[in-house]
A protein has these predicted regions:
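Intrinsically disordered, low-complexity N-terminal segments enriched in charged residues and glycine
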Residues: 1-96
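Conserved P-loop/Walker A NTP-binding site and adjacent catalytic elements of P-loop NTPases
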Residues: 93, 98-173
Length: 173
């Protein structure tokens, strides 16, 4: 993103705001707050070109990290399970709605396939896909199963957190 010194036009500010909405989830709040602070300073006549340039660099960095996460999504293979027959429909619903409730028989693949369906529609690129389990052993078992299906090692794209035990990395989805 190119921000020219001394020219913080409404169009450039609008571009910054738009780009912030595309950043990593964990960065959005802080970037928006920093932009608001800079705009407030600008209204008070305390223009600081260097701070606008630094903000633009932070936004670019966050966008690059998000692109790297997108590029690191492993190849997704869906085994022959009942939920796999409806994966396109479920993916479309996940893309269109903030909340989707999926009901199915035990063993239909909900637990292991829904996170992969979420990955297939780009979820997990701006932040983590959370998957809760009622017991510690279940959390480890589910994570191991998904890792096995993706052909990776624990902690790469898939990890788990149980109390103080963290098996995730920066690039975990």
């Amino acid at each position: 993103m190119v921000i020219t010194k001394g020219a913080h036009s409404q169009a450039q500010i609008k571009k910054l705001k738009k780009k912030i909405t595309l950043c990593l989830s964990r960065d959005r709040f802080f970037l928006k707050r920093e932009l608001d602070r800079l705009l407030n300073e600008q209204r008070q006549g305390k223009m600081n070109d260097e701070k606008f340039l630094q903000l633009a660099d932070k936004i670019t960095y966050s966008l690059q990290k998000k692109e790297n996460r997108q590029a690191s999504i492993p190849t997704l293979v869906f085994p022959d399970l009942p939920i796999s027959e409806r994966k396109d429909e479920i993916a479309q619903l996940i893309s269109a709605h903030q909340v989707v409730i999926v009901c199915g028989e035990t063993g239909s693949g909900k637990t292991t396939q829904l996170p992969k369906i979420c990955l297939s529609v780009g979820r997990g690129c701006a932040g983590f896909i959370g998957h809760t389990q009622p017991r510690r052993i279940a959390a480890r078992t589910v994570a191991n199963r998904i890792v096995e299906e993706l052909g990776e090692t624990m902690g790469q794209s898939v990890g788990y957190k149980i109390r103080f035990h963290d098996k995730t990395q920066e690039r975990s989805l």
